[in-house]
Amino acid sequence: MNKIKTKCPAKINLYLKVLNKRVDGYHNLETSFQLIDLADDMSFEVCDKDVSIASNKDFLCNTENTVFKSAQKIKSLFKVNDGVKIHINKRIPIGAGLGGGSSNAASTIVALNSLWKLNLSIAELINIGKEIGADVPFFIYGKNSLAKGIGEKLKDTDSIKDNILLIKPNIHNSTKKMFDELDLYRENDNFKTLSLIHI
């Protein structure tokens, strides 16, 4: 097998409770992740040596995005000689809190585990994913989940039964910037609990 195609679903958080900021810069939190039908498409094809990215969105074709970082991390960790050509058909809006970049990274990690015949377990893939981003473990796990820690401690939860109307205003919000601006103490201090979203 030299080529894989995947769907990368978006997610919503039914609630997000930010507990405190850790000394490593991440935040401890509690949340409920739900996968939704909106998805990007990706394809992966083994090639000689290098990692390359093509996309219907030019801003993704660089070495700073989560897909490239994920591929390079796996290639370096496991000393893989092969390269990979990656194509991203982006549908999930960026800056919307829908997890598109994390979903793409998770698909990359899972696909390369198969293409490069690494035979890593889900737990091992999740450990790699959490170094890329806090939401990546959830997308690797691939099930609706309650999450704790930075988002890597996952427990199955039921799917919601109601239909969802998703509205994306023409505003870009950086998740990192929003977390950086929270007024929270670090975990070694007394800390406040702040709920960003509670439905």
Regions found by a protein language model. Give the residues of each.
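N-terminal beta-alpha supersecondary unit
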Residues: 2-81
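Short, surface-exposed charged micro-motifs
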Residues: 41-43, 85, 137
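Phosphate-handling active-site elements
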Residues: 76-85, 111-132
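Short pre-catalytic strand/loop immediately N-terminal to key active-site residues, enriched for Gly-Thr
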Residues: 30, 84-96
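ATP-dependent small-molecule kinase catalytic core of the GHMP/sugar-kinase superfamily
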Residues: 2-31, 118-196
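DPxDG-like acidic metal-binding loop motif
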Residues: 96-125, 138
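Residues within alpha-helical segments
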Residues: 71-72, 109, 130, 138
